[in-house]
Amino acid sequence: MQTEVSQFAAFIGIDWADRKHDVCLQVAGSDTRETSILEHRPAAIDAWAKALRHRFGGRPIAVCLELADGPIVSAILEHDFFTLFPVNPSTLAGYRKTFTPSGAKDDPTDAAIALELLRRHPEKLKPLHRENDDMRSLRRLVEARRDLVHDRVRVTNRLIFTLKSYFPQILDWFRDKETEVFAAFIERWPSLQDAQRARHDTIVAFFHAHNVRRASVVDRRAQAMKSEVPLTSDPAVIEPARHIVAALLPQLRALSAGIVSLDSEIAIRCRALPDYHLFAELPGAGEVFASRLLAAFGEQRDRFANAAAFQKYVGIAPVTERSGNKHWVHWRWACPRFLRQTFVEWVASSIPHSFWARAFYDSHKAKGASHNATIRALAFKWIRILFRCWIDRTPHNESRYLAALQKRHSPILKFAAQDPS
């Protein structure tokens, strides 16, 4: 615990839930523990906090719970005399097993265990420091954007599946199924028969109205519409499918509009943060990955002792286990999945845009490593580089890094020399 224990007037363990929170409180210098139940209502939490402020004269109070974000955390941090010490749920579960080997779980007991962990092992816990509003907003926005993208993929896949049952030709005419021109075309001509009844000039005017003006593309699509043969003329297939498509199109449009709106807000937040330039020019990052990487690193540079600690936190560093003569290495399961996904996705995107990343990838593939294993290894390498850039507040320089590899006679350069680009 980075904060001196002696400064706290009381210590609190909380086992949070959706509707109520179990609380276990111990006054500093006392062995007596007080248990209570706190309703999850803003007024109840506020009244509880004000009562504690009055009772202890506004002196600092330490609070331990297995959560670093969420409604209860936001409510607690509204009061400046609380110092929050979040603990990993797996850590608390392991500590619980020390006292209950049977695996029994009880909410009031969990609150007491959180308090016990706070009192007996303060050196294992770090206080939660609230980052500035823009950084905290950015972190929520980029994760929400990824969720909307996932939802859009799900809706698009359902739309494609439905179109394949009666109107598969349209899937060949439009490569990008998430565009407004694709949605507008289906809305106007929801079947091949409808499209074939349209005049050539009407088709051309439609594409021009949606900024598709290349004559070869428009003519090819218009001719294909007239020459294609319907997959089926069965109304029992076509009519239900048309209704399903009509139900999916508004969802697709709403999700696309939501993503555009979030992109605008994310851009505003990024421009307000001084570290954005460290990630904006990374190979293959673009605005989407740059904002996610910025949110992943945050602004608290004393939070991680070194790059290895950060690699473990985001789930890129593997886990090594030993038992007797056995030794095995496996994927790290307990980690923030979105952060790990951020690095895995960006690293894959960096390969076509980074000379050394391409060489690193090719060298590992030449050794027989799988694509996924190679991406994880490359992510491990990239994080070490980015961590140093983040600590030093210096953007990554590809030429400088290549010169460093050459100075160390890195074997990666052999593959870099063979790169056809």
Question: Would you name each region that the model predicts?
Answer:
Residues 1-421:
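A detector of single, family-specific signature residues
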